[in-house]
Amino acid sequence: MATEHEEKLGTEDSKWLGEYSQVHMNVFGTPLRVMDHGQGAHIWDVDGNEYLDFLAGIAVNSLGYAHPKWVKAVADQAAKVAHISNYFASEPQIELASKLVKLAGAPEGSKVYFGNSGAEGNEAALKLAKLYGRTLPGALPSIGGKPARILAMTHGFHGRTMGALSATWKPGIRKPYDPLVPNIEFVRAGDKVALHDAFAQTGLGRYGKGPVAAVILELIQGEAGVQPLGADYVKFVRELCDINHALLIIDEVQTGIGRTGKWFAFQRDDLSGGVTPDMVTFAKGVAGGFPMGGMIAFGEKLAALFTPGSHGSTFAGNPLGAAAGLATLDVIEDENLVANAEARGEQLRDGIMATGNPLFVSVRGRGLLDAVELKHPCSHAVMNYCLEHGLIVNAVAPNALRFAPPLIVTAQDVDQALAILKDVPTDLPDD
């Protein structure tokens, strides 16, 4: 028997999806639905079907949809000035940078670079790391030095632009674009011996490599299935970086801005081991749905390596995006949404296992970045079942579903999601 959603699908979705396929390059596949409007944690498609959104634009819509304070801030700024060139600055841009430095607990002299996406934030971090690498003794041409290296993790994801892609593990999206940026190497995530060996390859001899300028990692590897890297391992990375004068770059594109129950995931000792990074990248949730990303360089000496002309973007830190970012951070503070992320995430994880559904083997995650491990690789079938029953989730891996609800999600919203998850059939087909 068809569900209510199945019966209502068709007319408007079919019309718009047909046109979509005619005018859009096929980089995302066929969209699941054509969406029209949202409110809070709920969104409606063009056929009028309502969905509880437990993906939030992949951890982007921190405040859900149409939060009145966010809408007002963006509208007010648009009525003043939406964009100025980077020959000028704006008050929202300056205020947002100051606030991010403060929330990150970065030391005096730390500075922010704004871009428009997570990939751009990571591009900035990688470029700054390369500039830093040129200052290392083992990389100096005058003594026969070799180009400094950047180490990245297997299964890590940092973006699809050429530099960020060079530090992204997934072979399927890397290989078509070979050769990528040189001197970026992968080490097995969580493997201390492999990391030690990678550092130990530094040397001026015939078989030696250039010094390690930086290590880039995610504390929770989101695209790998919401897999925490491990606090003990991260602490070890920091120790090796310190010994070898290398930078630690923590990619918080998905984990930052309150999502894991702290403003930044590195502020959770159970994820970071209490380490402090040299750079943090951010995006997704920072502006509540407006395209924005960036990087924080910790300390004046590192931040000073970027000089006029060394990096930039036309739209970086534009007033409209900055106003959206300020409104997002203000609402997160005013409504205590960091604590809500912690509480609702615990409710979700505990509730999934309490459903008694034998399809659900285990849960993992922090705050409102979570995953459930499935008994067999049927994540796409589960995702489609949930969608048909009014719940948006993500098939992040064959055996795992990802949840990243807006930070404004309520206990009632979580209960509604759990009621749908409880009834997911156990005999759905494998992907």
UniProtKB/Swiss-Prot annotation:
Name listed for the protein in its UniProt record: Acetylornithine aminotransferase
Catalysis: reaction(s): N(2)-acetyl-L-ornithine + 2-oxoglutarate = N-acetyl-L-glutamate 5-semialdehyde + L-glutamate
Keyword Transcription: no
A GO term, aspect molecular function: identical protein binding
Record keywords, A-Z: Amino-acid biosynthesis, Aminotransferase, Arginine biosynthesis, Cytoplasm, Pyridoxal phosphate, Transferase
Binding site for N(2)-acetyl-L-ornithine: R160, S313
InterPro entries: AcOrn/SuccOrn_fam, Aminotrans_3, Aminotrans_3_PPA_site, Class-III_PLP-dep_AT, PyrdxlP-dep_Trfase, PyrdxlP-dep_Trfase_major, PyrdxlP-dep_Trfase_small
Subunit: Homodimer.
Alphabetical list of Pfam families matching this protein: Aminotran_3
Source organism of the structure: Bifidobacterium longum (strain NCC 2705)
This protein's pathway: Amino-acid biosynthesis; L-arginine biosynthesis; N(2)-acetyl-L-ornithine from L-glutamate: step 4/4
Ranges annotated as spanning the membrane: none
Entry binding sites for pyridoxal 5'-phosphate: G118, A119, F157, D251, E252, V253, Q254, T314
Misc remark: May also have succinyldiaminopimelate aminotransferase activity, thus carrying out the corresponding step in lysine biosynthesis.
Cofactor(s) of this protein: pyridoxal 5'-phosphate
N6-(pyridoxal phosphate)lysine modifications at: K284
GO cellular component, one term: cytoplasm
Family: Belongs to the class-III pyridoxal-phosphate-dependent aminotransferase family. ArgD subfamily.
UniProt remark on cofactor binding: Binds 1 pyridoxal phosphate per subunit.
Subcellular location: Cytoplasm
EC numbers for this chain: 2.6.1.11
One GO term of the biological process aspect: L-arginine biosynthetic process
